[in-house]
């Protein structure tokens, strides 16, 4: 599986990527610290799964998820957040 990880906090992004790489099902993971770069990548490259922070500057994870699904309808989305108030709207 090919994955992307998107988080605007570098420390959290590093931890997320390390956790993803520990999965034997993920063969490749690309990391991005902003939504625009991630979306540009998805428009040019097929991915299987996207791990997204929800609360980011600019577009934000929820809006990015919608745009990823438009570009890659079969992509799975996993939201990663420490904010309880975002958990329900993410579904």
How should each PLM-predicted stretch be described?
Residues 6-8, 32, 50:
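Conserved sequence signature across two-component system core domains
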Residues 29-36:
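Conserved Asp/Asn-Gly motif in the active-site loop of CheY-like receiver
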Residues 18-23, 41:
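Alpha-helical interaction/dimerization surfaces of two-component signaling modules
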């Amino acid at each position: 599986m090919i994955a992307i990880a998107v988080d605007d906090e570098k420390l959290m992004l590093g931890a997320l990527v390390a956790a993803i790489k520990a999965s034997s099902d993920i063969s490749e993971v690309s990391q991005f610290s902003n939504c625009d770069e991630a979306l540009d990548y998805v428009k040019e490259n097929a991915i299987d799964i996207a791990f997204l922070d929800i609360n980011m500057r600019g577009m934000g994870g929820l809006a990015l998820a919608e745009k990823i699904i438009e570009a890659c309808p079969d992509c799975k989305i996993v939201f990663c957040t420490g904010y309880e108030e975002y958990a329900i709207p993410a579904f």
